[in-house]
Amino acid sequence: MGRRKKKKFIDRWWVKFLMVAAAIFLIGEAGMKIWSSEAVQTRFVYMWPYQNEILEYSSKNKIDPFLVASVIKNESGFDTEAVSHAGAVGLMQIMPETGEWIASQMGLDHFDLEALRRPEYNVRLGCWYLGELEYEFQRNWVLMMIAYNAGRGNTRAWMQENGWNYDFNRIEDIPYPDTREYVKKVLRDRDKYYLYYKNKIKNY
């Protein structure tokens, strides 16, 4: 849902990340084994903050929690204060007008723009929206992620113009380069979250 503005603590995290990566590079093959280990990957690459909120609302909306984690990783880097140049807010980078529409569809009394910075509220609305997209695009994650990134209207237009059906999976055919890369990254990272966390989640 757009680029984001990083907070200072995110910048500090990147400094630590680069220091660790440099150290591993310097010690060669052994370092690469350390880098690819689950402990390092989950600590520096595939972190999962706000897991309780994600599990709760992904379950309520019957969507894949690992996909939600991947969306957040790619949208905001788990930065609750992230704001894109276009105005998308919070963990799942929800645009204010989209958030207002979601709130109305959910039957909420009112939409709270400032609350989008709160993890629980943002994830609640974002998971509902992902559930809506999953239903609309018949559980096709490629189409679902195209719609999340480029909009439902563009997705429908591309389906019509290019003869895509609900079995579409040719990511390379996506017209927007940014959306194409976004879909690749989200689906790749979803598989990594599944690999590292599937045995750590109860009742999954």
Give the label of every model feature segment.
Residues 1-13:
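N-terminal Lys/Arg-rich, disordered targeting/topogenic segments
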Residues 30-204:
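Catalytic glycan-binding domains that act on GlcNAc-containing polysaccharides
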Residues 15-33:
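Hydrophobic membrane-insertion alpha-helices, especially the h-region
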